[in-house]
Amino acid sequence: MKLPLLTVLLPLMSGCDATMFRTGFEPVEPAIMYQAATLTDAEAPSEALSVVTYNIKFGGARITFFWECGERYNMTSEEVNVNMAGLAEIVREIDPDILMLQEVDIEATRSAYVDQVQYLLDNTDLNYGAYASQWKSDYIPSDGLGRTESGIATLARWPLVEAERVALPLQVEQPALDRYFYLKRAILRAQVEVPGMDDFWSINTHLEAFSEDGTKQTQIGILEEELMALDAAGATFVAGGDFNSLPRDSEQLSDFADECDGLFKGDSYVGEEDFLDTLFSDYSSAMPADEYSADNAPWFSFSGDGVEWTRTLDYLFTNASWVDGSGVVHQDVDQGGIETIQWSDHAPVSALFELEVAQ
């Protein structure tokens, strides 16, 4: 997602301290920690862990916002609560042990100040959470955006420790003012205290969508370095998120039917065909590469128009093993067992992490 030019801020910022907007982050800083209001008993897993990644579009469901060629900037509290209830129902239905979320709002004007991390903890069987901001400003005086606080979160049945936000590089092609208020991409790493497992980590990220300056590829490289370091240290990890990249052997790379004509350029992945090759070659993917090559459609996890799923942007990887055949994109009743297209522009992706191999 890309913000419109915030030229309205130029005279404002020239006459005051720009730090008043608080948009920046340290290279590494502690995550914000959460706990459900009422904890649910979490037994030790026996054979597998259910792992899910899900971009929830900040509880926006199928409201058409300005970057989608719509007119909306903010939601009412009623809209947010209805949409969050739908998302919570999906999470309860899939019943993950570890849930990696992207585009989660906490105390943001656009989502009526609903803390969506706390909402999902309090309305599912997940107990603990860690949050890392990717878009933060106390106030954006443009188009009614107001306070912005959105990011990535990892929720789990068991405690999360050593949770940290690791900053990713920003787009260098943007004008300085846009870059100041634009998303600050990050990795959220957290150790999950799964009973019977030592040194088990969750790595969650949401990578750059629109860049022509190599930023996305650089971010993927940093993610690879993070995973390589954990692997070299003997740790076990599950990694996932919205990578905003297509796998090799994608039949379509641009000119998707669900794109709109507006302020924002459509998604084109031409020239990026090899961006995820190292992840697929070095680690186990919940989406087998050969199955995707044979038939792309069952693995599509994004729908821009709310009518059909058109491409694959969301992934799960591990340096251990997934249960064979357990990876699935929950598109609808026939493909994944539950209708999801009405609640977000992304579908949840799940897989079963094989405990016996890891242990």
Question: Language model features by range: what are they?
Answer:
Residues 13-15:
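C-terminal motif of bacterial Sec signal peptides marking the signal peptidase cleavage site
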Residues 17-149, 357-359:
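N-terminal, active-site-proximal structural segment of metallo-dependent hydrolase catalytic domains
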Residues 49-56, 86-113, 155, 190, ...:
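Active-site beta-strand/loop signature of hydrolases that rely on acidic residues for catalysis
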Residues 71-76, 104-106, 170-179, 205-214:
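Surface-exposed cleft-lining segments at the edges of enzyme active sites
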